[in-house]
Amino acid sequence: MTKPTSTADKSLLGQTTPYCQAYDPTILFPIPRQEKRDELGFDLKTLPFTGEDVWTGYEISWLNLKGKPQVGWAEFVFSAEAPNLIESKSFKLYLNSFNGTRFESEDAVIACWQNDLSQACGKPVGVRFYRLDESIVLQGNLPGHCLDALDIEVEDYQVNPDLLHTDSDQIVSETLNSHLLKSNCLVTGQPDWGSIVVRYEGAQINHEALLKYLISFREHNEFHEQCVERVFTDIMRFCQPKKLTVYARYLRRGGLDINPYRSNYEQVFDRARLVRQ
């Protein structure tokens, strides 16, 4: 039997697992962020950014004390400074464990989420729950100029930061985006589709080079959060902007979508869902 090479290899990903019919916080599977940050050359004490991972849960339900199902959707906000991320399949199974469990109130459910997720990731987690009758329209578009119409020839489908370069020393402030981001799950290899924003101030980044670089994630195996941190780190290293924000909005899988944000100067991020979400 092959020995697992990382914490992720020991998770429930890729395994046949039964759905738990009763609330069970032990399902949650934390994965140390540092395992991948070692590759990028920083740790919690030397983070080159601040940020958060905003998970949207669409399959939210539990029973009230009379056994009547309650439904809604929720946002879960994890700090990039948390030592652990939560493996997505375990998160899905954890949320599903509420489906057959009776709770006294909505507040009791939210308190469980906050307590369990905070313990698992190692830092307080923010939770916003929305009833379906109070939900607002959140669909929007990515800010900035979309690179996807550029007529480029692509040859690299494994991450290649050497593609990145600037055009000149002229300092610009611009926001660029692309819907062509695709990476694969670190463990199962299943495709993760997303859209990404790069906002920066510094020497102008060559647009064709940036698009080729983003497309080069197409056969790369890494979790959503890790991909965004890699994009941030590579751009800082190869283009050296003074200010940089990178965030991605990924399509949902298993009733959850993951939206990582990283920046060295911004604290507030747009959370509008995209049409594919």
From Swiss-Prot:
It comes from the Bacteria. Disulfide bonds: none annotated. Signal peptide: none annotated. It catalyses: 7-aminomethyl-7-carbaguanine + 2 NADP(+) = 7-cyano-7-deazaguanine + 2 NADPH + 3 H(+). GO terms for cellular component: cytoplasm. Pfam families: QueF, QueF_N. GO terms for biological process: queuosine biosynthetic process; tRNA modification. Its EC number is 1.7.1.13. NADPH binds at residues 88-89, 253-254. The active site is at residues 185, 192. Substrate binds at residues 86-88, 224-225. Keywords: Cytoplasm, NADP, Oxidoreductase, Queuosine biosynthesis. The keyword NADP applies. It is found in: Cytoplasm. One of its GO terms (molecular function) is preQ1 synthase activity. Pathway: tRNA modification; tRNA-queuosine biosynthesis. Belongs to the GTP cyclohydrolase I family. QueF type 2 subfamily. Homodimer. Catalyzes the NADPH-dependent reduction of 7-cyano-7-deazaguanine (preQ0) to 7-aminomethyl-7-deazaguanine (preQ1). This is NADPH-dependent 7-cyano-7-deazaguanine reductase.
